[in-house]
């Protein structure tokens, strides 16, 4: 667990990166359907002047893990064709993304894979949402966070990889094992939340919520 000084440092870094968002990064995010308001709310930024420990992320998009107490983690994403596509600071522990939405007055919560998809569901579509960074990052204590919700929706990516794996469906199955009352919403073949929003609009999700 981070102490107050560490949270302040990460929050300051996130705000610095947000203020340094490059034209290229902004164009990339807008191409994913994110508005200026959403980009600002989620403190998305560019690593132009990295703090200690973030040097390898220079030039990448910064995605802060925000909580009511401040930023507790950071993930970075390339917007070019280089590798690795994503980067975590060494030694950083991974929790749920966007736990701020767990504090919203809502009887419904959505769970999906990945940060950008979570931002789309929460910030663009308007469904309170949290994100999991893959099957291995679903923790045994996470189910306790959802006990108060009347409805839990798992928006499961349906994107088959070159090796034949379907990580989104694997994650949905894993979550369902711990949260049996959760509903799995299967996305169209070879899509994720972001792609569905861009192709079909917010109504695709809202119609399934109303079903």
Regions found by a protein language model. Give the residues of each.
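Short, surface-exposed amphipathic charged segments that create phosphate/polyanion-binding patches used
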Residues: 58-60, 144-149, 192-206
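Acidic beta-strand-to-loop metal/phosphate-binding motif
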Residues: 111, 149-163, 186
């Amino acid at each position: 667990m981070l102490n107050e000084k560490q949270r302040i440092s990460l929050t300051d870094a996130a705000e610095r990166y947000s203020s340094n968002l490059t034209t290229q990064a902004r164009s990339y995010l807008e191409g994913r359907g994110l508005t200026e308001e959403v980009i600002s709310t989620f403190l998305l930024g560019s690593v132009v002047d990295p703090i200690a420990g973030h040097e390898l992320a220079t030039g990448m998009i910064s995605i802060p893990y925000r909580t009511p107490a401040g930023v507790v983690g950071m993930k970075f994403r390339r917007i070019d064709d280089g590798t690795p596509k994503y980067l975590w600071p060494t030694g950083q522990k991974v929790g749920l993304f966007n736990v701020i939405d767990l504090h919203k007055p809502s009887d419904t919560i959505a769970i999906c894979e990945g940060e950008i998809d979570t931002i789309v569901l929460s910030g663009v579509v308007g469904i309170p949402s949290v994100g999991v960074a893959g099957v291995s990052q679903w923790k045994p204590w996470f189910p306790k966070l959802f006990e108060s919700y009347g409805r839990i929706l798992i928006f499961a990516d349906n994107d088959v990889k070159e090796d034949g794996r379907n990580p989104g469906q694997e994650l949905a199955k894993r979550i369902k094992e711990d949260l049996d009352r959760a509903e799995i919403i299967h996305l169209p073949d070879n899509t994720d939340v972001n792609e569905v929003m861009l192709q079909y609009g917010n109504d695709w999700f809202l119609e399934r919520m109303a079903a």
